[in-house]
Amino acid sequence: MELGGAFTIFLALCFSCLLILIAWKRVQKPGRLPPGPTPIPFLGNLLQVRTDATFQSFLKLREKYGPVFTVYMGPRPVVILCGHEAVKEALVDRADEFSGRGELASVERNFQGHGVALANGERWRILRRFSLTILRDFGMGKRSIEERIQEEAGYLLEEFRKTKGAPIDPTFFLSRTVSNVISSVVFGSRFDYEDKQFLSLLRMINESFIEMSTPWAQLYDMYSGVMQYLPGRHNRIYYLIEELKDFIAARVKVNEASLDPQNPRDFIDCFLIKMHQDKNNPHTEFNLKNLVLTTLNLFFAGTETVSSTLRYGFLLIMKHPEVQTKIYEEINQVIGPHRIPSVDDRVKMPFTDAVIHEIQRLTDIVPMGVPHNVIRDTHFRGYLLPKGTDVFPLLGSVLKDPKYFCHPDDFYPQHFLDEQGRFKKNEAFVPFSSGKRICLGEAMARMELFLYFTSILQNFSLHPLVPPVNIDITPKISGFGNIPPTYELCLIAR
């Protein structure tokens, strides 16, 4: 009996292994992918890719397999690109082939291929072209984006003055002001800083970005086929984004009730007008789902990335007080103590510009980039990537490529200055990605970073609560994003 039972268990195990191998073979793509660590059926490369240090795991694998290699995220093969040359060759030199959006499973349940950031094919081209046009028109219209940022910076300075030099956590001070800039474009108005609905919205955005960077989210991205049916923290992202969608859908209803097609007030109005124009076209991409999700894409990206960069920037400037002093000297020389900073000042302030670039480079807010996908069978560096293969361009590995930055792991503004102290560009500076999927809001984000940093440092000096040498810039969480550590500082009026 015991032998018979053992034999039955053995047969069951063999049968289970056979089923796993059959399933594994079905998900294998034809073609010739780059080399990489040997995967375990279904589990993939879980043993080599730590869910709490995914980016660092990829860098370690690069040491063995080179700048282009394959890892299996669960049963799914993903091609990893490291360093400037490999990423540029794919995203710029072969821009069309690598222009697809890869799978971001942790939010796919919410977006289902809709919205400009996660769409593909003709839907993506239509939504991107429309979004770029509207952002450009608002940037050059009666009330430019620069004026909106300057106005919002003024409100922020007033809030900082109210603190009277007491210690504060800058997180929501910065997210409120940055979010109000994109709010004025997509919603047509700004929120009061104490608006409870606005604060709730910002907390959801902040929490979503954090949740997308947790080990749970990385695990979900690897095993979404199973984990979508299981309870746990990984589902928190889904519910947060659904709440954000509900908020935007409610704003759309408000706009629709008072829409004047001759006088669009914001991005939502412009999209609604296009929806009415295309109402008899059953195949139009101008529908309610794409409106809500594209608005969410713009609002989310326009809030969290810039405010996180500012938070990191405050830390780095306090850690290097000589840099803060030199920026203030440049502000005094070019702008003076009273005039409001403008974008035109940037070309006359090479050191400040270099510092802002170096903050973005060193902190690399989205180190793994957003996944790409090859839209057709693609020959790349002697390999064949079958149509539909996901590709991770590791932006963090480009921003810290030692071939292009002599001190890749240090804060060194001279990376962006020539021997005469003039600003110099660096082709490996890609915090907004590159190629056809480059960030829609790059111009706005660059404008915000310059105007906020100069406005704040023109009016306040930043003081840490610990000695500069003890300031730690290690991310609180590092996954999809590098989440800044929580800290307090004092803003002393000049």
From Swiss-Prot:
Catalytic activity, as annotated: an organic molecule + reduced [NADPH--hemoprotein reductase] + O2 = an alcohol + oxidized [NADPH--hemoprotein reductase] + H2O + H(+)
Single GO term (MF): arachidonate epoxygenase activity
Bilayer topology annotation: Peripheral membrane protein
InterPro entries per UniProt: Cyt_P450 (IPR001128), Cyt_P450_CS (IPR017972), Cyt_P450_E_grp-I (IPR002401), Cyt_P450_E_grp-I_CYP2A-like (IPR008067), Cyt_P450_sf (IPR036396), Cytochrome_P450_fam2 (IPR050182)
Source organism, top-level taxon: Eukaryota
Keywords: Endoplasmic reticulum, Heme, Iron, Membrane, Metal-binding, Microsome, Monooxygenase, Olfaction, Oxidoreductase, Sensory transduction
Keyword Hydrolase: no
Protein name: Cytochrome P450 2G1
Protein location: Endoplasmic reticulum membrane; Microsome membrane
Any one Gene Ontology BP term: epoxygenase P450 pathway
Tissue localization of expression: Olfactory epithelium.
Lineage: Eukaryota, Metazoa, Chordata, Craniata, Vertebrata
Keyword flag Zinc-finger: no
Cellular component aspect of the GO annotation: endoplasmic reticulum membrane
The protein's role, per its UniProt record: Cytochromes P450 are a group of heme-thiolate monooxygenases. This isozyme seems to be implicated in olfaction.
Positions contributing to heme binding: C439
Any Pfam family hit: p450
Entry EC no(s): 1.14.14.1
First-listed, main subcellular location of the protein, grouped into a coarse class: endoplasmic reticulum
Cofactor: heme
Recorded family membership: Belongs to the cytochrome P450 family.
